[in-house]
Amino acid sequence: MNEKKPKPRRLAYGVDPKRPQRYSLRQARYDALAHDIDALAAEAARQGRRLSVLDIGAGGGASPLHLRARPNFAAIDLDGADRDRQYNVDESLYRRFFIADLTEGCPELASESYDVVICEQVLEHIHELRKPMETIGRLVKPGGKAFVGVPIFLPPLHLARRHLVPRLDRLVRSTRRRDHVQAFTLASVKAALLAYSKLSFVEARGFRIISGGILRPLEERRAWWAFNRWLGARIPAACIEVQIVLEKPAASQKA
């Protein structure tokens, strides 16, 4: 009698165990940044150098899973950082892993030491944004880039999330823990990043206007992913999540 072989584990984009859908819209942000960083690594390799990348607020380590599947990962020196080890991230995914608190400015990390800084799904958990955003800008080398991703609301829904939801929680005596302490719009997070990081705006791209539920089966189809990427590039402010790409002017531009 033949035993049934277990089905292989389904991974988002072939690499990410967080979601089983092949083209998961929730994980699309990591696929997008991996695509761009891989292109930067290819350019660095052509110039005979390596690309230094920092994944700050690394969480469960989604970024390296997507990056290491790319053809130019061998040209990347990838470091990770988080305030503690609560997520039990596989530190072997990184060249080095730092215990460093973004809210304290990450003094362990040298200024202008990374070609790329990734800060995905971190800032919405932080009350005071000035120092974390200043730190992102401080760590990027001249000519380097930052990829900053947060959930956002379409105005005026951010006001409901900020003011009405806490009142309703108190009214119904909800015990639900809400980890998000910020209610960003695209305009508000972009303005704060430009003011505090001192980096220049490159682009904003949105992910997921509507997803999950009865639409989740569509996330097995590349065409649905492509449509959402197209839509998110054109109306990022209407999306549930946004990724803002920033750049530090090269030293020659500052002169």
Language-model features: locations:
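Conserved N-terminal segment of class I S-adenosyl-L-methionine
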Residues: 1-112, 116, 133, 206-207, ...
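S-adenosyl-L-methionine-dependent methyltransferase catalytic module, highlighting the catalytic core
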Residues: 8-23, 27, 127-137, 145-250
